[in-house]
């Protein structure tokens, strides 16, 4: 297995797909990295030479990925909650942040239903 940005990427897959195993790199960014490194997207990771791997590492290092990206995202969410903007309030309440309706849906974000006891002796 090749190692890029301290992540083991699979050898049996194409380079573009293998790069997506790194948090913060999707398909479009992976193909962009391959173009900058002059590596064919369709070659398998196992077939890459050490020079090509080092070029991929060098190009991928320029992007925010893995721990730095996770930290940045969590700090952004904390900042939203501190300044009490709409998104921060939704995060704090555990409700959907991006405008989805919550009257009938949003069970994943709200958690399981809290049942209310009905009237006795009908």
Curated annotation (Swiss-Prot):
Residues 106-122 have a biased composition (Basic residues). GO terms for molecular function: rRNA binding; structural constituent of ribosome; tRNA binding. PROSITE patterns: RIBOSOMAL_S13_1, RIBOSOMAL_S13_2. Pfam families: Ribosomal_S13. Residues 94-122 are annotated as: Disordered. Part of the 30S ribosomal subunit. Forms a loose heterodimer with protein S19. Forms two bridges to the 50S subunit in the 70S ribosome. This is Small ribosomal subunit protein uS13. It comes from Mycoplasmopsis synoviae (strain 53) (Mycoplasma synoviae).
């Amino acid at each position: 297995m090749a190692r890029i940005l301290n992540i083991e990427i699979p050898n049996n897959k194409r380079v573009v797909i293998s790069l997506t195993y790194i948090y913060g790199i999707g398909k479009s960014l992976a193909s962009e990295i391959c173009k900058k490194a002059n590596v064919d997207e369709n070659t398998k990771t196992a077939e890459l030479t050490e020079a090509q791997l080092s070029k991929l590492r060098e190009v991928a290092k320029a992007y925010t990925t893995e721990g730095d990206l996770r930290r940045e995202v969590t700090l952004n969410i904390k900042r939203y909650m501190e300044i009490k903007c709409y998104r921060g309030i939704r995060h704090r309440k555990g409700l959907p942040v991006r405008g989805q309706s919550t009257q009938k849906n949003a069970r994943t974000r709200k958690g399981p239903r809290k049942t209310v006891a009905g009237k006795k002796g009908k």
